[in-house]
Amino acid sequence: MENQYQRIVSATAREDSQARRSKPLFLNAWSQTSSVDFEVLRSISAPDPQVEVENRALRDKVRYLEAKLQQHKDLLSQIHATSARMQQASSLLAESRPPTPPAVQSHHILTPPSSEICAPAQNPQILDYKIISAPDDADAIEIRLAAESLNSLSTSADSDRLEICLGDENHQQSNHHNSQQQYRISNGIKRDGSSESADTPLQFIKRRKLQEIQLQEEIPRQNIKLPAKPQVKARNGSFTDLNKGQQQNMDNVMVSIGPNNTCVPASVFENINWSVCSLATRKLLVTIFDRETLATHSMTGKPSPAFKDQDKPLKRMLDPGKIQDIIFAVTHKCNASEKEVRNAITTKCADENKMMKIQNVKRRSSGIKHEKENII
């Protein structure tokens, strides 16, 4: 049998059998398929619109959540990077910063009445010293003047070049040469101390040298270079420092405001309100010219068209170079037009002229009243 199958497999086909296989197979069949069956197929294959809408909404929500998640990831990465940079910067600062000495706490120290004032500290801006209030009082007050307190003392009346002495004023003058623990802080505050006997009551004395001659006498005795002291004015028994030295130094600094090199004090120029053109112009006019000059002069020196028919004396013209510098400064600082600045100058001159006339009338009227009183 195996030999027969092998012969059949290896046998060659006839031509008529090959032609019969290549012809298509036609099947005549009768079926009972109706249109309802096709509708069912369409309903199964076609998706439900509501389900499609829900699927679309779910996909949108998924995309939104993915976007939010990505934003959170970016934010966290930025926060981590920033914190890492800050930690690195703080570590570098800590490495480069010199070691800070331990803070000295203020506390009360029991010292005998005959003890002298403590030696000056090494740091000229931080001062620790003691003041003994009475010979029988063992409690000493330890006062710490730091940089902040020194700045606050510089604005007070008794802060500049203040002397703190222990003992009577007459006895202090006699023992001034024997005092060895004297020093001066960089801003001018100094302290003199000397040991006193138990019989002499200790007093807290604040003295100021009012004249430059006394200052010159103190310099060779103390061998200390002190800055020049401003004038001190006494009111009701107390000394008040006017602090005019710094203001005069600021007033001596002049600022050029235009191409013609018209100069005004730097303190005045910095305090001008440049937001209003007219106010800035008036301030510069009053600073450069006096009020009498503004009252008797005008910007152009020509008569006003409004007073052509009236016989009024002509006013002299203000310095054109200074006027040009004022216009230059105001137009650049206030972003105003040249016409606005010129109108402000003309108005200021007219106002000063009116004020001068009113003052002259008041003076005449007061003079007439005095004459009548003298006659009566």
Swiss-Prot record:
Keyword Repressor on this protein?
A: yes
Query: Main location per UniProt?
Result: nucleus
GO BP terms, alphabetized: negative regulation of DNA-templated transcription; negative regulation of Notch signaling pathway; positive regulation of neuron differentiation
Question: Where is this chain's protein located in or outside the cell?
Answer: Nucleus
Q: Give start-end ranges for the coiled-coil region(s).
A: 50-79
Q: Name one GO molecular function term.
A: transcription corepressor activity
- Impact after mutating K354A: Significant loss of DNA-binding and transcriptional repressor activity. Complete loss of repressor activity
Q: Which UniProt keywords apply?
A: Coiled coil, DNA-binding, Nucleus, Repressor, Transcription, Transcription regulation
| One GO CC annotation | nucleus
Q: How does it assemble?
A: Homodimer. Interacts (via BEN domain) with Su(H). Interacts with Cp190.
| Domain note | The BEN domain mediates DNA-binding.
Job description of the protein: Can act as both a transcriptional repressor and corepressor. Represses the expression of genes involved in neural development and preferentially binds palindromic sequence 5'-CCAATTGG-3' to mediate transcriptional repression. Acts as a corepressor for suppressor of hairless (Su(H)) and inhibits Notch signaling during peripheral nervous system development.
PANTHER family named in the record: BEN DOMAIN-CONTAINING PROTEIN 6
Give the protein's recorded name.
Protein insensitive
> Which species is the source of this protein?
Drosophila melanogaster (Fruit fly)
Chain's gene name: insv
